[in-house]
Regions:
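N-terminal structural module
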Residues: 1-93
């Protein structure tokens, strides 16, 4: 049995619920960045994955705020071109 779902017909909230249900359990990472003022930022991400090892490629799904502006993590990455992906162990609850 197969289903066809037109993602363009779904709201952003419906797309999010559908896509997050595709991979279970969802790996969680704390992505840490530093602002141009030296302020540390840590944000949880479940939209991330490894896409290669040579070169090493990590993809982050950076969401925007409800008003469409970038969140601190994206702003910090764009300013300093640096971030750290910290993996959460399954034993941490």
């Amino acid at each position: 049995m197969s289903h066809h779902i037109d993602l363009d017909e779904l709201t952003a909230s419906e797309r999010y619920k559908l896509l997050t249900a595709l991979v279970i359990p969802r790996p969680i990472a704390w992505v840490t960045t530093v602002s141009s003022e030296g302020i540390n930022n840590a944000a949880p991400y479940s939209f991330f994955n490894v896409f290669g090892q040579d070169p090493a490629v990590i993809i982050l799904g950076l969401e925007h705020k409800a008003d469409g502006t970038a969140k601190d993590t994206e702003n910090n990455i764009n300013l300093l071109n640096e971030f750290v992906v910290n993996l959460v162990l399954p034993t941490i609850q």
